Amino acid sequence: MTANTLLVELLTEELPPKALPRLGETFATKIAEGLKARGLAAADGAFRWFASPRRIAITMAGVAAEAAAKEVTEKLMPVAVALDADGKPTPALLKKMEAKGIPASAVPAFERRMDGKAEALFHTAVVPGARLAEVLAAIVHDAVKALPIPKVMRWGDGDATFVRPVHKLVMLHGAEVVPGRVLDLDAGRSTRGHRFMSRGEIDIATADAYEPTLLAEGKVVPDFAERRADIERQLLAEAARLGAQLDDYTDLLDEVTALVEHPTVYVGEFEAEFLAVPQECLILTMRANQKYFPLFDAAGKLQNRFLIVSNMRMEDPVNIVTGNARVVRPRLSDARFFFETDKKHKLDSRLPRLANVVYHNKLGSVLERVERLEALAGKIAARLGSDEAAARRAARLAKADLVSEMVGEFPELQGIMGRYYALHDGEGAVVADAVQAHYQPRFAGDALPAGNVAAAVALADKLDALVGFFGIGMVPTGDKDPFALRRAALGVLRILMEAPLPLDLAALVADAAAGFKPGLLTADGFQAQLLDFMRERLKNLLRESGGEVAAIDAVLALAPTRIDLVPAKLAAVEAFRALPEAEALAAANKRIVNILKKAEGAPGEPDVALLQEDAEKALFHRVIEIAPLVKSHVANEDYTDALCVLAGLRAEVDAFFDGVMVMAEEPLTRQNRLALLAQLAGLMNQVADISRLSA
């Protein structure tokens, strides 16, 4: 069977840039899977995917024109039904053979073998392999249908649907066109190149010539990764030539790669007077609206230059450079206007307008929320022994920039602009910084708010949201989390654990709930539900940080509410697990838990006078001896030392279970031994539920 390189390309109108890489990769992957499933390509066959603004494509080497034939054996029916007493085929067998296209002459070749408890007839036939020319169109059609496209469109007079109009379909196997029709288009070998730098149609001679032909004749770099790498090389080279630096550009680089087919980087410039506007505004304007790459000096200060990724390569790029500078100037002027206009009104004066901004129809306005945040942030700051007045002031101003001109135009700048306006209004740096930082952490790996005042406001903001929405029954389900409550929960946990802050989570939740008007939060048991939700988030957070699963489960089984102490407890449990006594003590603890579950009523305190066996006396006295030391270590947060002391109980615990019948027939003896085990369990499980460590 002739094997050759296969090319499939869809030429389209400009595809959605943010979805382009996924469209290209999925399209190619699904075609490769279809070829492999039909035996036309090796199971480990490699392929390349291509994606540019106007095309998605795949090339795959070693694709056969026809798959190898294969033997297929299928069960027909039980012999008792298939053959009569003389061994001749019954009408039932003949009917089935006719339906399957098996000639009557094939009966003698049928195989008889046991199938379960009955003998059955089996037919083996050689099935011809799939032919590429007959199945490729169906494979491409299925790949198109499998693309992650939320909305499709129709064009022209046909019924085909796709994310954008499709103009050409190329399907080549080696040098031969593979016939087929997909999306109302007949397959061919012609495509088009760059919209401006190439003219007319381009014929692809062979599948292997696809990439070099597009580059040479079409002025298109079809490989997404290659185009991205080329843009990055040019960006870094230009920045180095100018003695400037780029900041984090990954997302913008991906987007720009999806917007150009023949990238060239040029340097643009704007008037230095615009640098009087906060640089975050200018950066966002250049990135979001113009897709420019801002340049910075070594200190991270914005320069009045930027890099342009053009879709054209020109010998004299002056028109491109001046044109882009001309386009960005009105944007920067708008930003300056918003900034100057906003500074005319103090943040304080904007608060009444928040009464007209609905936070949630069941939770009131943003102004009502601000009043809750102010009270809660003050309480948290007081618990921390921090500046309560500063925390209350920062919380009061935290949402005022939501009704500013700048944030109205660029919502991403909320908090950032609040800080600038607070400083302009004469607020202290601590208050202004907290206004900006109260949104942090906004995503995984984001910085935490610096300082206790900022942390207090950030906690208040997130706890108010969590308590409010849980209190009205708006709980995240599955992958639906419209109010970003999972993110808020992780933010609270990270602040408490990483700052760290000596605050009780249950008390914080109760404080937040107390700030709402009576009767507003009506969901049953919502505080307990919220704490369970946050513990589940904490479990995931600890696992992602590399914590041992069993150790995490052991620590969280005690439902700790001092989140700041969890890392130390986790480290102590992981150290304890490495001790030779750990497994035996964990197993004993598990046994104790099971015994106490079956006991009737509370065991009470053990009575030394009722102890009979030497082993139980030894255990009792050992527990009494080490209990103060364990409790002292726990009180001092020396959890590793506490567990090491407990490891010394192994000999007494082993001896107790080897020589003492806990469930004695005499009731007082039985109850006393249960009381001793309860006392032991209470001592052993002050740091974590040790029974969870048992295999």
Swiss-Prot record:
One of its GO terms (molecular function) is ATP binding. GO terms for cellular component: cytosol. Its EC number is 6.1.1.14. Keywords: Aminoacyl-tRNA synthetase, ATP-binding, Cytoplasm, Ligase, Nucleotide-binding, Protein biosynthesis. It catalyses: tRNA(Gly) + glycine + ATP = glycyl-tRNA(Gly) + AMP + diphosphate. It is found in: Cytoplasm. GO terms for biological process: arginyl-tRNA aminoacylation; glycyl-tRNA aminoacylation. It is an enzyme of class 6 (ligase). Belongs to the class-II aminoacyl-tRNA synthetase family. NCBIfam families: glyS. Tetramer of two alpha and two beta subunits. This is Glycine--tRNA ligase beta subunit. It comes from Azoarcus sp. (strain BH72). The lineage of its organism: Bacteria, Pseudomonadati, Pseudomonadota, Betaproteobacteria, Rhodocyclales.
